[in-house]
From Swiss-Prot:
This is Nucleoside diphosphate kinase. It comes from Cupriavidus metallidurans (strain ATCC 43123 / DSM 2839 / NBRC 102507 / CH34). The keyword Nucleotide-binding applies. ATP binds at residues 11, 59, 87, 93, 104, 114. GO terms for cellular component: cytoplasm. SUPFAM superfamilies: Nucleoside diphosphate kinase, NDK. It holds the Pfam family NDK. It comes from the Bacteria. InterPro entries: NDK-like_dom, NDK-like_dom_sf, Nucleoside_diP_kinase, Nucleoside_diP_kinase_AS. The keyword Chaperone does not apply. Signal peptide: none annotated. Homotetramer. It is found in: Cytoplasm.
Amino acid sequence: MAIERTLSIIKPDAVAKNVIGQIYARFEAAGLKVVAAKMVHLSRGEAEQFYAVHKARPFFKDLVDFMVSGPVMIQALEGESAIAKNRDLMGATDPKKAEKGTIRADFADSIDANAVHGSDAPETAAVEVAFFFPGMNVYSR
């Protein structure tokens, strides 16, 4: 198994519910280390740039509006198969379809307000981690 890094965002709905610590506990219980973290209130420009891959999709405006609606917690996670582990922890995009015990089943309200974002592949993980944590402020341990 390879040690990977992935990006995770705890979205405004989950931050507002005060479940950051519960989500972090799940990362750590799965063997993932938080190697960089920050709480930010994304600007519209940052959200549009980060989600630019979805620009032509009908949900783009609503996604950006949601992501700028309140603060988010952004973290880089590291561990064996970190991308797949994080995606398993998150559950299906639609919380109604997510397995019990996943972050989205437990904390998300809808497919739009779905609590968390996670990178879907090594290539996107590298781009996403670099977007929010450029330079040397990621710390392996």
